[in-house]
Curated annotation (Swiss-Prot):
Family, similarity comment: Belongs to the globin family.
Protein name as it appears in the record: Hemoglobin subunit beta
Positions carrying Phosphoserine: 44
Record PTM N6-acetyllysine, positions in chain: 59, 82
Binding-site list for heme b: 63, 92
Tissue note: Red blood cells.
Organism listed in the record: Hippopotamus amphibius
Amino acid sequence: VHLTAEEKDAVLGLWGKVNVQEVGGEALGRLLVVYPWTQRFFESFGDLSSADAVMNNPKVKAHGKKVLDSFADGLKHLDNLKGTFAALSELHCDQLHVDPENFRLLGNELVVVLARTFGKEFTPELQAAYQKVVAGVANALAHRYH
């Protein structure tokens, strides 16, 4: 991902304020609610029958945190996202058979949740920088599919 020094500083600066448990759970929950076909990958999570059930599901929250912990690892390696996410790309492609479009959808949900969480602090410039990052991560996760 190509970010200017200012974009990188802004992305990392905001990320230091992110509660990965809350933001991760909300982002994954929103993905499962807005794009219900994604729920098929999470059948072992129990009750996903309504928006409330999804958003309050402890397994959704826990997996959302796990996803954002991996995303945070990517932020430390912005110059090598494909290498950073190679094992996860292989897992999601070869074993889980996740449609790679879902990575882009989740990235967009993450940006929405960051905007909701940080309000005016999440400026248009910061949003643009985060869009670059989530697109880069989605591309890295989809790498095995190509």
